[in-house]
Amino acid sequence: MPKFNPKQMKDLERMLGLKTEQLNAVKVTIELQDKILVIDNPVVVKMLAQGQEVFSVMGSAREESKQQQKVEIKEEDVKFIMEQTGKSEKEAREALEKSNGDIAKAILALTEGENK
């Protein structure tokens, strides 16, 4: 890969009409249909070219299966579901975990049997 010095890069950007900005990203997550790619401590550059935002991400990626992604359950979500359904904290939390944190799905799962 050819090396460019910063001045050459700026000249090239100006010539091509690119505007770039380096972002202070901590982690980049790319969700695919069957897995998740996670890049910790990436170098992320945002470019604006012809009215389009383009992101360049550089770093080492690791793969995670979708099942490995643990959803963070917020206490406020648990309380909200308890209020809406009249269910216990344990039931509300389990429904949230099964629905991957989707509040609407959790409420539907807890109330479906009651509406039949």
Curated annotation (Swiss-Prot):
<comment type="function">
    <text>Contacts the emerging nascent chain on the ribosome.</text>
</comment>
<comment type="similarity">
    <text>Belongs to the NAC-alpha family.</text>
</comment>
<dbReference type="InterPro" id="IPR002715">
    <property type="entry name" value="Nas_poly-pep-assoc_cplx_dom"/>
</dbReference>
<dbReference type="InterPro" id="IPR005231">
    <property type="entry name" value="NAC_arc"/>
</dbReference>
<comment type="subunit">
    <text>Homodimer. Interacts with the ribosome. Binds ribosomal RNA.</text>
</comment>
<keyword id="KW-0694">RNA-binding</keyword>
<feature type="domain" description="NAC-A/B">
    <location>
        <begin position="6"/>
        <end position="70"/>
    </location>
</feature>
<dbReference type="InterPro" id="IPR044034">
    <property type="entry name" value="NAC-like_UBA"/>
</dbReference>
<dbReference type="GO" id="GO:0015031">
    <property type="term" value="P:protein transport"/>
</dbReference>
<dbReference type="InterPro" id="IPR009060">
    <property type="entry name" value="UBA-like_sf"/>
</dbReference>
<dbReference type="GO" id="GO:0003723">
    <property type="term" value="F:RNA binding"/>
</dbReference>
<keyword id="KW-0813">Transport</keyword>
<dbReference type="InterPro" id="IPR038187">
    <property type="entry name" value="NAC_A/B_dom_sf"/>
</dbReference>
<dbReference type="Pfam" id="PF19026">
    <property type="entry name" value="UBA_HYPK"/>
</dbReference>
<protein>
    <recommendedName>
        <fullName>Nascent polypeptide-associated complex protein</fullName>
    </recommendedName>
</protein>
<dbReference type="Pfam" id="PF01849">
    <property type="entry name" value="NAC"/>
</dbReference>
<keyword id="KW-0653">Protein transport</keyword>
